[in-house]
Amino acid sequence: MSNPKRKILVTCALPYANGAIHLGHMLEHIQADIWVRFQRMRGNEIHFVCADDAHGTPIMLNADKLGITPEQLIEKAKADHIADFAGFNISFDNYHSTHSEENREYTSAIYKKLKANGFIKSKVISQLFDPEKNMFLPDRFVKGTCPKCKAEDQYGDNCEVCASTYSPMDLINPRSVVSGSTPVVKQSEHFFFDLPSFEEMLKAWTRSGSLQPEIANKVQEWFESGLQQWDISRDAPYFGFEIPDSENKFFYVWLDAPIGYMASFKNLCDRTGLNFDDFWKKESDAELYHFIGKDIVYFHSLFWPAMLEGSEYRKPTNVFAHGYVTVDGQKMSKSRGTFIQASTYLKHIDPECLRYYYAAKLNDRIEDLDFNLEDFVQRVNSDIVNKLVNLASRTAGFITKRFEGKLASTLENQALFDEFVAQSEQIATYFETREYNKAIREIMALTDKANKYIDDKAPWVIAKEEGTDAELQAVCSMGLELFRVLMSYLKPVLPKLAERAEAFLQTELRWDNIGSPLFAHSIAPFKSLFSRLEKKQIDAVIEETKALFAESVKAETAKKGKEMTACETKVEPIAPEITIDDFAKLDLRVAKVLKCEAVPKSDKLLRFELDLGDHTRQVFSGIKAAYSQPEELEGRFVIMIANLAPRKMSFGMSEGMILSAGTGGADLYLLSADSGVTAGMQVR
């Protein structure tokens, strides 16, 4: 008896309609698309929607700067985004915009329901106001001198030089980024969503398995620090939706953005006849999944489910978060040419190369993925060209030339074929649980076995012998049967290569017929299925990216030069002399950061879990001001004093000291080791 068909709705986080799609965005959309395509192959009813996040002050101001309307700006962005996603074969059923009538309707309805249920509060707040532009200023649209280190040209919420945080009203000599005028303080009534009212519901939901363990643990920290009322309103002028029954008040972009998931699906329903309530009503038995980046976990794990609960809609089945993309072990960089836009990549490289590389490294955890350019070329050529496609290319010619394109009527090696088919459920499980790296590893292991079979049988030798036609046909047909199975497994990852393979094999690649051989089946003449990836293609992408951002990099470099002058680091005097025997008492070791997190209720401490090769240790380090995203340190190698006596702290036992350079506070830099080191190595 077959399993009942599942009803699934999948979304990706909404790209902001004020910039281009880059390879960081593509990680999420490729991850989701592979999962969606796999579910389609399994016969499930699945719908895949997304939209542009099209509201907010940045869009309004950028449009004004360009001399166009916000509507014109977001329409251009939407067209560009759709083209980029299509270029990477992202198979959305609908791509919409939050600036739509559907989103206006649902945003207003949800707000009214929350208000009717007592979850909307109001209070008067003080804000900086631009008297020339006649507008209240968000924190990032105010600049001035840092009240702590006196660095100039700093934003209204934090200093990029000393990392201090503060109120925009604490800035020295504040000015409006919009007009250059000196802002004044004005009061305004704002509306707040009563998030604390949902704490017990959220605690139960976050512990129900609806979040990855890493997210659930992080949410627990937020509970411990206390949930706050959430300001959901902004004052005019603002590009967005007006709040019902209010004057010159607009919904904050983060209120209507997730509702955009519902609006995009409603737009799809209206076009196709799908039933919206089947997927969104409170008692819906459909599955709802959000694929997001780790930077927006707070909104999707707290505000969004609380909004849905308070307005009597269903909550997500699960929220799948992923890490960031690094390039060659470092953050994407405009100056190094690694902040690669999707459109730049598509000019030079087959999108399936990136789909495969991301899949080969993606798992179900919130880990950053390193896009190593040298490994990228090697892996694509080794796995896809040399192994997978080569399996077909060195057998198909014999079938076409010697047997008029017809495959054999029996399997030459039934046991080997059965072994390949038997892996279908394990590979399916890996795709289902988003452990794509394990699926790829399993598929490539089978590919190696298939190539070994051909190597051992050597059809090119058989072809030269008299009276061996039946054997030659059987061996080559067997190789192509194994190729068909492998391409079926890889179809969610490499959809365009799968299309070409289907045209060549003259059959549809389906999950439910993997175990059905193509006996006495006619195939088309073999044509090249995939081209080698060359280093010169990578170089072209890097150089074009550098040229694209040359002016902005130049301006940023000049700005950083000013900041360094404003906050000159004093060189401390050399400490008193010690002997070699004194130094020898220190046992310095290389340690790998397994986990790094902020210590709740501490302004300074980070908790490290360190791998020293043969054991792990916990170390607390007062470098929080210098590393505001502690999870980004995970996977790095650091230097520690391993024989320092353990110190009991209120948060736990600290078993060593991590070394860093700098004057303290935000001016601290972890010492790291050169490539090639391993955890536990002694520093000499």
From Swiss-Prot:
Enzyme Commission number(s) from the entry: 6.1.1.10
Span(s) of short sequence motif 'HIGH' region: 15-25
InterPro entries named in the record: aa-tRNA-synth_I_CS, Anticodon_Met, Met-tRNA-synth_bsu_C, Met-tRNA_ligase_1, Met-tRNA_synth, Methionyl/Leucyl_tRNA_Synth, MetRS_core, MetRS_Zn
Regions annotated as coiled coil: none
GO annotations of cellular component type: cytosol
Keyword Nucleotidyltransferase recorded: no
Cited CDD domains: Anticodon_Ia_Met, MetRS_core, tRNA_bind_EcMetRS_like
GO BP terms, alphabetized: methionyl-tRNA aminoacylation
Keywords: Aminoacyl-tRNA synthetase, ATP-binding, Cytoplasm, Ligase, Metal-binding, Nucleotide-binding, Protein biosynthesis, RNA-binding, tRNA-binding, Zinc
SUPFAM superfamilies reported in the protein's UniProt record: Anticodon-binding domain of a subclass of class I aminoacyl-tRNA synthetases, Methionyl-tRNA synthetase (MetRS), Zn-domain, Nucleic acid-binding proteins, Nucleotidylyl transferase
Record's cofactor remark: Binds 1 zinc ion per subunit.
Cofactor: Zn(2+)
Chain residues that bind Zn(2+): 146, 149, 159, 162
Motif 'KMSKS' region: where in chain: 331-335
Reaction equation(s) it catalyzes: tRNA(Met) + L-methionine + ATP = L-methionyl-tRNA(Met) + AMP + diphosphate
Predominant subcellular localization, coarse grouping: cytoplasm
Protein location: Cytoplasm
One Gene Ontology term of the molecular function aspect: metal ion binding
Stretches assigned to the tRNA-binding domain: 582-684
Binding site for ATP: 334
Family according to the record: Belongs to the class-I aminoacyl-tRNA synthetase family. MetG type 1 subfamily.
Assembly description: Homodimer.
Biological role stated in the UniProt entry: Is required not only for elongation of protein synthesis but also for the initiation of all mRNA translation through initiator tRNA(fMet) aminoacylation.
Protein name: Methionine--tRNA ligase
Species per Swiss-Prot/TrEMBL record: Glaesserella parasuis serovar 5 (strain SH0165)
Gene that this polypeptide is encoded by: metG
